[in-house]
Amino acid sequence: MEKDYNTLNHAFYAELLYILGLEEKKDKIVISKTKNTLAYLIKSQYNSLAEDDIISLLINYNTRLVFLRILEATMISHDGSYGGFLKIDTIKNFSVVNDLFFEVLNTPKEKRREDLPKSFSKIPYLNSSLFDKTPLEKDGNEIWRLDSRELALYPTSILKTKDKSQTTLPLLEYYLAFLQAYDFTTTPKDIQDNVKTNHDTLINSAVLGLVFEKLNGYKEGSFYTPSFITSYMCEDAINRAIITRFNAEYGWKCENLKGLEDTFKSYIGDQDKLEKFKKTFLSIRICDPAVGSGHFLVSALNYLIYMAYRLRIFGIGAEIALQNDELLIYHEGDIFQYTKPKLSDSHAQDIQHSLFHLKKSIIENCLFGVDINPNSCEITKLRLWIELLKHSYYKIEDNQITNELQTLPNIDINIKCGNSLLSNHPINSPFATSPTLDFTKELADQIQKYKSAVQRYKDSQSSKSEIIDELEGIKATLGGHLSKNHPANQSLLQNLESFVKVYGAGVFDIKTDFGRDMLMEAMNHNYYFTPTLISKEPTPMDKKGEKLLAQIKKDYEILESMKHNNAFEWRFEFPEVLDDDGNFTGFDCVIGNPPYIRQEAIKDKKSNLQKNYQVHEGKADIYVYFYERGHQILRDGGLLSYITSNKYTRAGYGKNLRTFLLKNTQILSYIDFNGVKVFDSASVDTSIMTFAKRIPQEDYAIDYLACQEKQIPKNPNFLSIPRSALSNEAFTFASGDELPLLEKIKSAGTPLKEWGDIKYGVKAGSKAFIISTAKREEILANCKDEEERERTSQIIKKMMRGANIKRYQYAWGEEWLICTFPALKLDIEDYPALKAYLESFRPRIDPIGTENGGRKKGGYKWFETQDNIAYHKNFEKEKVVWNPVNGVYYFVHIKEPMYFNNSIFMITAKDGTKLPALYIVGVMNSRLQRWLLVQMTNLIKEGDYAYGGKDKIEQLPIPKIDSANQSIADKIIALVEEILEKKKQDSATDTTKLESQINALVYTLYNLTDEEIELIEKG
């Protein structure tokens, strides 16, 4: 397995956190209590700032300083005679840091102050928003006000390896020395025999991205995506997108990359065609709608560079390879390392110039990203600037190399901050319902101005504020057109006209925003009371008028909320995906790792999601909605590739998404990482889904791969899965041999749910309701008389947890459940001793909400269990019980009354019927059923964690007992009885031979052939 150097440098990360004044606590980043860190200084200087604002300033300051260190390292690697500028003898305080930020990086050389340090003279003007003051800084929270105080060195500081006697340093000196201790680029001295040797201290842009993601990602549910994932996804999706685009544009029929390369070769020497190919290549639009640290966009950038090299449509003058998501540039067999050339016609200059401008063109034209977190957006911009900085070159004037590095362009405009899932206007919203010729022409002019202004912004070498104002004005105009056509506005105007004609405008109070706005709307649209022969005065308010007014207010509130809801308007935010008439054309490729936020954390967003997404389901996690949003913003035929949780393929909350995907997309491939921990910071099982936006054929083949380790093979051996294997009920990725077997087993049996009542255990909502035998005896001893003792003992029942259940056996753990179920309608005053015990847990057991220190809010009383448990009598019956979070899925027969917590499921006989419990236990514990569980539930493999929800387990088929199979069923039951007896005598008894006999009988029960049995045994 190829070593991935783009992994977290834990020593760097830990010490950086310490210097910044942050620490990790329970998967969160919080401000530490260490004195004289950067956070401590900010908090001391600006004591009214909220913690989020302090962290925002920290990230902003740190991002800039790290960029400066990378810039310095790049300049030194380009010019070995340059001594750098991040020296403590030059940068003596935070005031000088402030000068670097705003008087140097943010100021053209000719406009800089003359009193700046000499070492700053070679620093190029960075034409980017990274060094524009943030709103917090504009409010006076600036770095120059900070005072560098002595900070104790981190216990395992990298600085101690050089001087063990050093114990403290002033913060700024410590910070700079720490950054200087690491390499932020590879210089010629770091390359020996064409191999980089500085991996231990190298902090490349990918590693930085990982650090920034960890600093920034916990709150948003985002996790840094490993390079082996981003590189595979970008290669696969971009290849498909390029082939699709060129086939569509030139009428080609290339089926793969080799076919595309061969087609390009046939046009070598045809400059006119090559120019057209360049334009097509640079018109491919790729978007990450949850961009995070920008890892996918950087990976896409490098892969597009590599593809430009392979297709030979851009002259680069060097050989290019990709490794660990990074570009490797070779010239004449050696690793290419740009240094300041002596002659202006140097080949190295040409290579660096070509790479810089190709990267610039791709970043400006092809890469787009959105994130709800402004810090994430800044980090993404930083990473793209770093990628461009790698190939910055010295300018040429009068055929001579100068000391002036090429200025970096404004590449930040393609990365925007907003809520990707929330838009006020659908993608296909018209700018006008019945546009006139004049409006159509005016709109086309606006779109042209919009595109032109964006290009001027990217090329601008001076103040960008005027262009930004122009862009905001154009977007306001476009948004205004859409708002006029919004259903709420149309409804408001229609109802307002009807209302005023009959009831007049006197009801609108000019002192309120609503009243004033409605009077203005009525005046602007010439809505007046219209006298009639019958009504010469406005009609007094009646029920009809009140209803109209209520609807007007409702529409008004919708329109007002649109002004402040942080919506992101995909409809017009990126002019690159608008045609000349303003129609939304869409992206060629949508790629990413949407945030993983559980549905419990997005309750406040569910109402909006329900209104706007077909895939909505009450329990759906937020990544589900990104699939539909990604589909919306794709062009027809475009490709989407996401890595997400794989639960949607089988979970109940994924049914609407499954329906959507089957109806609206052609699924191209599915890579499952079930049981492989792809993300170090997340335990969720993941998969990569790739689809094309097109109406699918009736049936087609899907490429399927089950990854067993943390890598994707270079040439994956995909299985071909028929589309018919996927249904709304579940995506079952079974092979061609497995699918018929699955269908045969299903058709041979009756779903488990039809054998009896399936219920889960008791959700009490508090540990107070689960007690030990000693506590039970204490409560009973405190009863005042025998009658109370008898009553109380009747509602304290034996209970078990999942850990008490094994295959064919269980062991009660001396625990009891206080069964004060709401369904029993008990009066707690009848149980004084029990009341006294439970009262000791108040208010923790009061139904006042967890946010108020109690249990979940609900209609139950303080002494009752959280769930109603109307089926409490089922616990008293004979039952088959299983623990759905155990990877081996133990099924056990329990005859005695026994209660459970809510992690356990049971099936009992329906009233008036008998449950063949031993038969069910034998079949469900068989090898066949364990194989079936893997196919039909979220089970990973035997022994691994899984959760098989009720909706999946209840579908498992068991053959009904009839005259044809009675003898087989009797043998299974007899073997189960023998196993139970042996386990009763000695729980450690080995019963595998008896279980093997049951396995063979179960295969016969389902009429399986030897080949089918072999398939199950191998699985």
Regions found by a protein language model. Name each.
Residues 287-289, 370, 630-635, 695, ...:
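Proline-centric
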